[in-house]
Amino acid sequence: FENVLYPNIPSLLNSLKEQGYTLVIATSKPTIFADEILKYFEIHHYFDCIVGSNLDGTRSSKTEIIQYILNKYKDHDSSEFIMIGDRRHDIIGANNSGIDSVGVTYGYGSLEEVKSSKPTYIADSVEQLREIIINSK
């Protein structure tokens, strides 16, 4: 896999699950591949739902994926959702869907890319991400 599991992510996921958060993956990757990546890194069990693109190329934009998730969890208010992403399309998808977002600067996107997409919050570390999530509850 070309993916990297950032230090302290398993600890953060475990902490959020213990606090009762519902964790959902919203990825542009096909769902089946995202599922395999999560299993490879042994973090699959933290997630309640994994939503990606379909193998036929449909539901491929981040906005479509987030809208699908919001519809699936329509018993939750949109203010309860926060999109965490490292690329502009993650943040734009959140903005288009009316939910808060955290742009993380330690992923694949540059600081400039993340900032220019206007996230609600910016996190430079997993610890900052943890603080943002807990304080935005």
Language-model features: where?
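Short beta->alpha linker loops
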Residues: V4-N8, K29, D86, Y106-G109, ...
